[in-house]
Amino acid sequence: VNIRLKPLQALYFTQFLSAFADNMILFVIANLLRENGFSPAMLALVSISFFLPYVFLAPLVGPFADKHAKSIVLVIGNLIKALGVVLLFFIDQSSIMMLMLCYFTVGVGAVVYSPAKYGILPELTRNEDELFHANARIEAYTIFAILTGIGGGGAIANMTAPLISSGICLLIYLLSLGMTFFIPRMKGNASIRYGAEARRFFIDFQHLMNRPETSFALIGTGAFWMSSAVLRVAVLAWIPLALGINPESFSVSLILATTSIGIIAGAFLAPKLIPLSHFTRSLTYGFGMFLIIVLFPWTNITFVAICLLLLVGFMGGVFIIPMNTVLQDEGKRMVGSGKTIAIQNFIENLLMAVGSGIYYLITYIGISISGAIVGQGLLLLGFLLYLVKYRRRIVR
């Protein structure tokens, strides 16, 4: 049993390190922007370059992971991410286009890596029970990596020179890459054809969007991640302005991490609060999330801000988990788990790119960060109202 668990353990560590660095690199780039005199809103523009590979490569990365040995795909993903960080050492860091190129490269690595980390699990487990536990563990390692990547990784990036924090990021990606060599290589399906699979992706996409339950869940989870992505960038800029905290302080990333703690708590309690047979009731928590988003930018008391960010995360966690569960369950039956995740990634990242673009435009025309956060809240409200109307199609 121990011998079989070794590759799984290596996969968990690979995933933890890679996801930690994915979250830390955002803070490295935020510091580079600040050092070069760019406005905090520019981080939203740079963030879009990370989301775009998920949109453009979505139809191809699943087939790529299935065609080749998945452990090799993990190596390739980490290598591309590491290349994105290496570019930071050689580019003109005062050029926004060059910084976008680096983050775009990291995004390409992330989108290549993503399907393989889930797709390899059935190859490393013997039965459905083992697979279920392995899935739960990889999710737990990912959540822990997001928390520590924002809190710890963000703090390291804030307290060290960009050159040093970039070096640490690179080292973490290389460590993650090293761990993948403990995972056995199992042959992929060489008969897969990219053209046919890409066409299949859009047919499956249509299939999921035509069914009310899966369409509701795809739009709902997409709206949640759009808001989360914009909030992360906006709150990073908002904390120093509203709470008077030095942007280079350790506290900034810790305050930002409270939202993730809230999401974990919400995700944990969601099954007790929302029965799956009435999963659309999670919309109530979506409206709760909207209310807090439009309220919290007007406080300047740190403790109140932390409580509200914790609460917005909690509301978001309860909002998203029932929809995620229904989507994975229905999607698995309709088109398969891997394809459902690929379509979900496509929609989420498309909306994250759109949301970040709208946030950037709002700040570009001179509206305050607080006003832009409220604007994002109103965008979320638009999606929620659409889902209220759409809910009538679901007979549950």
Which sequence ranges carry the predicted segments?
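Substrate-agnostic recognition of the 12-TM MFS/MFS-like secondary transporter fold
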Residues: Q9-L26, S49-A65, A69-A82, M98-N158, ...
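Transmembrane alpha-helix termini and helix-breaking/packing motifs in multi-pass membrane transporters
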Residues: F27-G37, F89-F90, I143, L147-C169, ...
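Juxtamembrane intracellular "pre-TM" segments in multi-pass secondary transporters
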Residues: V1-Q9, R185-I219
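Cytoplasmic membrane-interface "Motif A"-like loop-to-helix N-cap segments
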Residues: K67-I80, K272-F287
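C-terminal transmembrane helical hairpin of 12-TM major facilitator-type secondary transporters
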Residues: T280-I320
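C-terminal ends and interior cores of transmembrane alpha-helices
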Residues: L79-S94, F287-I301
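Helix-loop junctions on the cytosolic side of multi-pass membrane transporters
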Residues: G119, E123-L124, S166-G195, V388-R396
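A single, central transmembrane helix in multi-pass transporters
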Residues: V28, T160-S166, Q206-A265, V318
